[in-house]
Amino acid sequence: MPRPAKHERSIAMYETILNLHTVEECVNFFEDLCAATELSAMEQRFDVASLLLEGRVYTEIMDTTKASSATVSRVNRML
């Protein structure tokens, strides 16, 4: 049987995430799926995005999250 296209696998992953009902289910899912460093990086980027949306300045965000200026800039470009 041929392997599904990458896009189809991505859609399946996102649909699975949408079907999670509790924070505990989400934590378990992501801890099973991701390495600790990957989770930490995602959490840091989420924090950066939240602070950018609040209108915080780069230096404050870098001090608060310990993210690099490159990470803050990358997240800002994606918003």
Range-by-range predicted roles:
Residues 4, 38-39:
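Short helix-capping and inter-helix turn/linker motifs at the boundaries of alpha-helical repeat units
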Residues 22, 38, 54-57:
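Amphipathic alpha-helical protein-protein interaction surfaces
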Residues 42-56:
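Short, amphipathic alpha-helical "recognition" segments used to contact nucleic acids or chromatin
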Residues 76-79:
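DNA major-groove recognition helix of helix-turn-helix
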